[in-house]
A protein has these predicted regions:
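Intrinsically disordered, low-complexity regulatory regions
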Residues: 1-130
Length: 130
């Protein structure tokens, strides 16, 4: 049974058993990045919201984050770094991967944000072509 309050299905991945909720990660991130991550994780999974709309919102939030963090790294605490890596790798979310790509995964860089925006735009182009 879907628990829409504590564990909404649009944040779940049927192929992988989730032991973490997105909120475990997003409450540890700066607001614009947290909002973008939420939209990326749920893209196309929430009833009434298309993948394109969710990714468009994620792109909007990442552009806001880029204005704020383009010239400085966003430092992550160890748990946030592990959770970001978990959602990017174990859930095969290639859009999230650039945010977690530093070797020690302890920072989000401006370049990582730019690459993530580019991956969102590529996915949006594919969705438009379908």
């Amino acid at each position: 049974m879907n628990d829409v309050i504590n564990s909404p299905s649009h944040y779940a991945d049927a192929a992988v058993s989730i032991t973490f909720e997105p909120v475990d990660l997003t409450e540890r991130l700066p607001h614009p990045i947290a909002s973008a991550v939420e939209y990326i994780i749920r893209a196309g999974r929430k009833n009434g919201c298309s993948e394109a709309v969710d990714l468009g919102k994620a792109r909007w939030w990442l552009k806001r984050a880029l204005i704020r963090f383009e010239f400085e790294d966003v430092k992550l605490d160890p748990l946030a770094a592990r959770l970001l890596w978990h959602f990017a790798v174990y859930h095969r979310n290639t859009i999230l991967l650039p945010l977690a790509e530093r070797v020690d995964h302890s920072v989000i860089t401006g370049d990582g944000i730019k690459i993530t925006i580019a991956r969102i735009e590529t996915r949006l182009e594919k969705l438009e072509a379908e």
